[in-house]
A protein has these predicted regions:
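A structural boundary/capping signal
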Residues: 1-128
Length: 128
């Protein structure tokens, strides 16, 4: 059995991000200069596949107005892992954070993007 450190998983995720794995409606704003942009939902799902835990959703606010949602993971003992937090500019503030149950089966949104990211990460970790 191959053992992977969190740093291995993080590197596999980061090197797998692309415009094709980000939220489709924001694909036009994705750039290699900010590769974490709009990758949070699919990244949180893949990390959940690999490490378990809970999915957490917060709100992104600009000038006090919600503009989007942000997703990350909570592992055992309340340890939170957010591999895409750096996507935000200084005017964007993530507030709150509620645990959201993972939907069973295929995702209602982002299924293709999630599957592509999951498969790329699995290949990089030698599980593909």
């Amino acid at each position: 059995m191959t053992v992977h450190l969190l740093t291995d998983i993080e590197q596999a995720l980061r090197s797998s991000w692309s415009a094709e794995t980000c939220t489709p409606e924001y694909r036009d704003r994705w750039t290699p200069d900010n590769p974490a942009r709009d990758q949070c939902g699919v990244t949180a799902m893949v990390l959940n596949d690999l490490l378990g835990g809970e999915l957490v959703r917060g709100e992104v606010h600009v000038d006090g107005v919600r503009t989007d949602f942000h997703w990350w993971n909570r592992l055992g003992l309340g340890v939170e892992v957010d591999l895409t937090r750096e996507q935000f500019g200084p005017e964007e503030v993530v507030v709150g954070g509620e645990v959201i149950a993972r939907p069973p089966g295929e995702l209602p949104r982002l299924q293709e993007e999630y599957a592509l990211l999951r498969d790329r990460v699995a290949a990089r970790l030698g599980k593909g």
